[in-house]
Curated annotation (Swiss-Prot):
This is Elongation factor G. It is found in: Cytoplasm. Residues 8-288 form the tr-type G domain. The keyword Protein biosynthesis applies. It comes from Mesorhizobium japonicum (strain LMG 29417 / CECT 9101 / MAFF 303099) (Mesorhizobium loti (strain MAFF 303099)). GTP binds at residues 17-24, 86-90, 140-143. InterPro entries: EF-G-like_DII, EFG_II, EFG_III, EFG_III/V, EFG_IV, EFG_V, EFG_V-like, G_TR_CS.
Length: 696
């Protein structure tokens, strides 16, 4: 079976947004107009096709990024193949967003026209910047009370520091929103309400918008001609580019991430979705337009590139693992080069294992089709892989490559969890193991002293959902303890410690002497170890033992048993014995050396500080600020946003538990907040003593 669509006709993109900016609704409309789903699913009644896990339907937020394949005929009448990756917008799931951004070629950033650029929009935007993802902006919810397109344009500059190139102007706003002005063609599109937005009329631009349309068209052309010297010279001489030239220049600038074309509409009211789909074809890159993916040769560690062509060796990245009730475990993978055929064996170069490709599926949001082969640029779901987890590379065994690993943040919150019955015990272990394989930002460990199972994640909602999924998908009932903060310890003073480890018990003894300088690592939170041994006072082969010994103590710090960060250790001297020294002896010596040095290093407890943003009606500002101050918060500032006030604060995580309930009762349910981890900071002495009493 040959390739059906040329790679130039592929668009792999995601829709990224803040909670409630209308992401699922927009995706639904896209699926509806591209003919994949017959009944439009509304999030309001819990029936959207993309949100296929039960909880998502209840909470109305999207949790797992499902990949969907669909087709769209562009303005030129040619069919294009869209692979849409649904990304979550809730801050507890930013890991999912990062993961989907890795495998996208482009994205549509949704804004709520009423709120403009919201806190989570900034987070997701920064992540997309990190991976240099070309984006278009869709200003959604133009029918909402308080919708303001022009303020949203301004906020993209002021809050994101990005250049939006306005491609459409809204006709009317709020309940009067009727359609859009197309600034390339200079005409107006007005939707017919009675056809569910499937039909629209092309009319002249309303008189009251003509001057504004002219002004924004000029801005658009100025941005476009910057992308090409000849076009710029012609423009300066008064020669206007043709509409097709404008489109190709805007495409060039979008793919180069120089600016972001901006559109508007209301997905809920079915207005503006089709021009947005045309724009995906016109402006977002195909897999052939983005730089080749870089990796390292698994044998030689040399950097190599893989291009999006079918005759290069196969390489693909597993970016999501899901449990499907019918097929079992599904691994979603993006093929970067080569082609994949059912039944072949591939190498997992990260794990050093082989995998056999059994069933290959192309996914719609909740239905699936078996395929025999897939090509560069495709996104496929593979059933029954044994050892592959998120972020692994699968490739041709003859040309092993490791595509770059993704970085996953450390969890900031943990809770103890125990099964309700003996029967649940075994099932719980299996369930947690499966969920951890799906989600690298979720960790499971057993507390050695208490024997409790501890789960940790990115926030309260994250862990709530994990416990909820255990109950639904694995039928495991569990009791959950109070959340605990992931404290850290660090040192504040420097000290040189000399320690000799001697043990003589007949036969071979143990001997090692180390002299280590411990000091705070002021540059980062990492542990840095270096050896300044000269003249072989400690032989090279024993030095890793010294590092390992120090690291083993850092796993449980001396203050209250929390992991240590920000330590720099330098091995400056030592001694060994020809017979009695070993790596183990040096490991034991350096461990004891660090323990002896600890009381002199000024060990200090650190706590995670969260960046909190509360959006509240004016009436409650006083109570919200008072409450945040009472939580040891530091108010960073406040600003008006429409009729609401935005309060920014840095607050210790320890004081943010159950905040959502308090905020609700304080503001009669009208205020909302988001928080994300920002940095670690020393804990005040009185609080530190309480923590020490509780944990040490």
């Amino acid at each position: 079976m040959a390739r059906e669509y040329k790679i130039e006709d592929y668009r792999n993109f995601g829709i990224m947004a803040h909670i409630d900016a209308g992401k699922t609704t927009t995706t639904e409309r896209v699926l509806y107009y591209t003919g994949k789903s017959h009944k439009i699913g509304e999030v309001h009644d819990g029936a959207a096709t993309m949100d296929w896990m039960e909880q998502e339907q209840e909470r109305g937020i999207t949790i797992t990024s499902a990949a969907t394949t669909t087709f769209w005929k562009g303005r030129d009448g040619k069919m294009r193949r869209f692979n849409i990756i649904d990304t979550p917008g809730h801050v507890d799931f930013t890991i999912e967003v990062e993961r989907s951004l890795r495998v996208l070629d482009g994205a549509i950033a949704l804004l709520d026209a009423n709120a403009g650029v919201e806190p989570q929009t900034e987070t997701v935007w920064r992540q997309a910047d990190k991976y240099r993802v070309p984006r278009m902006i869709f200003c959604n919810k133009m029918d909402k009370i308080g919708a303001d397109f022009y303020r949203s344009v301004e906020m993209i500059g002021s809050r994101l520091g990005a250049q939006a190139v306005v491609m459409q102007l809204p006709i009317g706003a709020e309940t009067e929103f009727k359609g859009v002005v197309d600034l390339v063609e200079m005409n107006a599109l007005v939707w017919r309400d009675e056809t569910l937005g499937a039909a629209w009329d092309v009319v002249e631009i309303p008189a009251d918008l003509q001057a504004r349309a002219q002004e924004y068209r000029e801005k658009m052309i100025e941005a476009a001609v910057e992308m090409d010297e000849t076009a710029l010279e012609n423009y300066l001489e008064g020669k206007m580019p043709s509409n097709d030239e404008i489109r190709s220049l805007i495409r060039k600038g979008t793919i180069a991430v120089k600016f972001f074309p901006m559109f508007c509409g209301s997905a809920f009211k079915n207005k503006g979705v089709q021009p947005l789909l045309d724009a995906v074809v016109e402006y977002l890159p195909s897999p052939a337009d983005v730089p080749a993916i870089k990796g390292v040769d698994a044998k030689t560690d040399a950097e190599i590139e893989r291009h999006a062509v079918d005759d290069e060796p196969l390489s693909m990245l597993a970016f999501k693992i899901m449990n499907d009730p019918f097929v079992g475990s599904l691994t979603f993978a993006r093929i970067y080069s080569g082609k994949l055929t059912k039944g072949i064996s591939v190498d997992n170069t990260v794990k050093g294992k082989k995998e056999r490709i059994g069933r290959m599926l192309q996914m719609h949001a909740n239905s699936r089709a078996d395929v025999e082969e897939a090509f560069a640029g495709d996104i496929v779901a593979l059933a029954g892989l044994k050892d592959t987890t998120t972020g692994d590379t699968l490739c041709d065994p003859l040309h092993p490559v490791i595509l770059e690993r993704m970085e996953f943040p450390d969890p900031v919150i943990q809770i103890a969890i125990e099964p309700k019955t003996k029967n649940d015990q075994e099932k719980m272990g299996l369930a947690l193991h499966r969920l951890a394989a799906e989600d690298p930002s979720f960790r499971v460990k057993t507390d050695e002293e208490s024997g409790q199972t501890i789960i940790s994640g990115m926030g309260e909602l994250h862990l709530d959902i994990i416990v909820d999924r255990m109950r639904r998908e694995f039928k495991v009932e569990a009791n959950v303890g109070a959340p605990q903060v992931a404290y850290r310890e660090t040192i504040t003073r420097k000290h040189e410690q000399d320690y000799t480890h001697k043990k003589q018990t007949g036969g071979t003894g143990q001997f090692a002497r180390v002299k280590v300088l411990f000091e705070p690592n002021t540059e980062s939170e990492e542990f840095v170890f270096e050896s300044k041994i000269v003249g072989g006072a400690v032989p090279k082969e024993y030095i890793p033992g010294v590092e390992k010994g120090i690291q083993s103590v850092m796993g449980a710090g001396p203050f209250a048993g929390f992991p240590m960060i920000g330590v720099r250790a330098t091995l400056i001297d030592g001694a060994y014995h020809d017979v009695d020294s070993s790596v183990l002896a040096f490991e034991i010596a350096s461990r004891a050396c660090f323990r002896e040095a600890a009381p002199k290093l000024g060990v200090q407890l650190l706590e995670p500080i969260m960046k909190v943003e509360v959006v509240t009606p004016e009436d409650y500002v006083g109570s919200v600020i008072g409450d945040l101050n009472g939580r040891r918060g530091q108010i960073q500032g406040q600003e008006a946003r429409g009729v609401a006030v935005v309060i920014n604060a840095m607050v210790p995580l320890a004081n943010m538990f159950k905040y959502v309930d308090n905020l609700r009762s304080m503001s009669q349910g009208r205020a909302a907040y988001t928080m994300q981890f920002d940095h670690y900071e020393p804990v005040p002495t009185a609080v530190a003593q309480e923590v020490q009493k509780k944990y040490a």
